[in-house]
UniProtKB/Swiss-Prot annotation:
<dbReference type="GO" id="GO:0046933">
    <property type="term" value="F:proton-transporting ATP synthase activity, rotational mechanism"/>
</dbReference>
<keyword id="KW-0472">Membrane</keyword>
<comment type="similarity">
    <text>Belongs to the ATPase B chain family.</text>
</comment>
<keyword id="KW-0997">Cell inner membrane</keyword>
<keyword id="KW-0812">Transmembrane</keyword>
<keyword id="KW-0138">CF(0)</keyword>
<keyword id="KW-0406">Ion transport</keyword>
<keyword id="KW-0066">ATP synthesis</keyword>
<dbReference type="GO" id="GO:0005886">
    <property type="term" value="C:plasma membrane"/>
</dbReference>
<comment type="subunit">
    <text>F-type ATPases have 2 components, F(1) - the catalytic core - and F(0) - the membrane proton channel. F(1) has five subunits: alpha(3), beta(3), gamma(1), delta(1), epsilon(1). F(0) has three main subunits: a(1), b(2) and c(10-14). The alpha and beta chains form an alternating ring which encloses part of the gamma chain. F(1) is attached to F(0) by a central stalk formed by the gamma and epsilon chains, while a peripheral stalk is formed by the delta and b chains.</text>
</comment>
<keyword id="KW-0375">Hydrogen ion transport</keyword>
<dbReference type="Pfam" id="PF00430">
    <property type="entry name" value="ATP-synt_B"/>
</dbReference>
<feature type="transmembrane region" description="Helical">
    <location>
        <begin position="12"/>
        <end position="32"/>
    </location>
</feature>
<comment type="function">
    <text>Component of the F(0) channel, it forms part of the peripheral stalk, linking F(1) to F(0).</text>
</comment>
<comment type="function">
    <text>F(1)F(0) ATP synthase produces ATP from ADP in the presence of a proton or sodium gradient. F-type ATPases consist of two structural domains, F(1) containing the extramembraneous catalytic core and F(0) containing the membrane proton channel, linked together by a central stalk and a peripheral stalk. During catalysis, ATP synthesis in the catalytic domain of F(1) is coupled via a rotary mechanism of the central stalk subunits to proton translocation.</text>
</comment>
<dbReference type="InterPro" id="IPR002146">
    <property type="entry name" value="ATP_synth_b/b'su_bac/chlpt"/>
</dbReference>
<keyword id="KW-1003">Cell membrane</keyword>
Length: 200
């Protein structure tokens, strides 16, 4: 439809150009008034050549315009601009989609980092509690071992003191009873006393 309108417009413009080419010289001649026309044949010949010149000039211009294909060039340019606009719109939409996608990925990565940070803090706190518990258990064990070692040392010291006390008691008793008691009584007393000390 656009092409038909263009052709009709070309025909109308061509017709107007021919009409103007004929009417302008006629009007120019008519405006000359009623003066004496010494050689009207020469004027008509001159007018004819002018019309032919104008027609040739108009034909050359129309041919040049068609050859230049101004409408086609403009239509192609319009199509190219529309294509460029469409491609730019598609590129913008693609860029916006990628921006949205990368924004979502960045937000997801930030959430994952926050989750990992929270998990690491929780794990670090659990590790801290475990280390503290192990340290407390080790301290309790060392305290218990020290208490047992102290108890053993106390028992050992008591035993040594008892043995020493028994020895001294035997010597003292032996010195006092040595004069009053016979050798057989003496051995019996020592054996009885040693038996009691061993039972303690």
């Amino acid at each position: 439809m656009l092409i038909q309108n263009d052709r009709r417009m070309q025909r109308i413009l061509s017709g107007l150009a021919v009409a103007v080419a004929i009417l302008v010289p006629v009007l120019a001649l008519a405006s000359g008034g009623g003066e004496h026309h010494p050689d009207s044949g020469a004027q008509l010949k001159d007018f004819g050549w002018r019309v032919v010149d104008f027609a040739l000039l108009a034909g050359i211009m129309i041919w040049a315009l068609k050859k230049a294909n101004v409408k086609g060039s403009l239509a192609e340019r319009q199509l190219q601009i529309e294509k460029n606009l469409r491609e730019a719109r598609e590129a913008r939409e693609t860029a916006e989609a990628k921006l949205k996608e990368y924004t979502e990925k960045l937000e997801k990565a930030n959430q994952e980092v926050d989750t990992l940070r929270a998990a690491m803090l929780k794990e670090a706190e659990a590790e801290k509690q475990r280390i503290v518990a192990e340290a407390q258990a080790a301290a309790a064990k060392v305290t218990e071992q020290a208490a047992q070692a102290a108890d053993q040392e106390v028992l050992k010291a008591r035993t040594e003191l008892r043995v020493e006390a028994a020895r001294l008691a035997v010597e003292l008793a032996g010195g006092k009873l040595g004069a009053a008691v016979q050798k057989a009584d003496h051995d019996r007393f020592v054996q009885d006393y040693l038996g009691k000390v061993v039972q303690l």
